[in-house]
Amino acid sequence: MEPGAAPGPERLFDSHRLPTDGFLLLALLLYAPVGLCLLVLRLFIGVHVFLVSCILPDSVVRRFIVRVMCSVLGLFVQQSDPRLRDVNVQVYIANHVTQFDHNIINLLTSCNTPALNGAPGFICWSRGFMELGVTGSRAELVDSLKAYSSHRENPPLLLFPEEAATNGRAGLLRFSSWPFSILDVVQPVALQVQRPLITVSVADSSWITELLWTFFVPFTVYQVRWMPSVPRRAEELSEDFALRVQEVGG
């Protein structure tokens, strides 16, 4: 999660999924029959992963089982410095690379990500988002999240202040300030995602399309890096707090 030194917007997003290199394109074509078989097989396995995650209560055991099952889907999760994860922090701040970042981090620790876009209901719930019933302004959302965080028994919040998935290579979108208005201590989490043959994510692609491509490729590796918690300074504005956390990410 590197601080963005104002890179051009076009550098932050990938518009083409397929490789332009001739050798990689040939390799992708040769792999395609295998990828299609994996896609079909993983769709069936994915249903079982979903059912298991629904049936089992949130616990270390469930996260372990689902993480192992996700490896069959080609999703591998690595984390560095797990001891830095602060059990007292109620807000995690992460960069945004794919449509499934919140699901991946949830394999490592219990957390909730509020639904910011899209219609509420089964799809929202099945994707692992938390519905707050707030459809108004960001101020109303912040008030709801403050109320949520005031109950210490609730899992921490996982928020993505970029509010859009980037390629994770060229820098970060400028952080929105509202996630830093909830509490005075946050913990940054850096995400890196790698996969062979095709790009990790494409701008404006739907989550269903991204899921199908994820099942098609041989594997996708998520690297999660925990960083020390960052407290707000005295009388520090949320905008300045957001900028400082973004810089700490580097």
Task: Please state what every model-predicted region is.
Residues 1-76:
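N-terminal membrane-anchoring alpha-helices
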Residues 1-24, 121-125, 137-152, 168, ...:
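Intracellular leaflet-associated regions of eukaryotic membrane-associated proteins
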Residues 24, 28-31, 35, 39-47, ...:
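Amphipathic alpha-helical interface elements that mediate macromolecular binding in regulatory proteins
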Residues 30, 81-84, 96, 109, ...:
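Residues that form ligand- and interface-recognition hot spots within folded domains
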Residues 35, 76-80, 85, 98-102, ...:
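Eukaryotic intrinsically disordered and solvent-exposed regulatory patches
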Residues 37, 88-94, 152-161:
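Generic beta-sheet signal
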Residues 43-140:
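Catalytic core of membrane glycerolipid acyltransferases/transacylases, capturing the structured
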Residues 126, 153-156, 163-240:
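A cross-family acyltransferase "interaction/gating" segment
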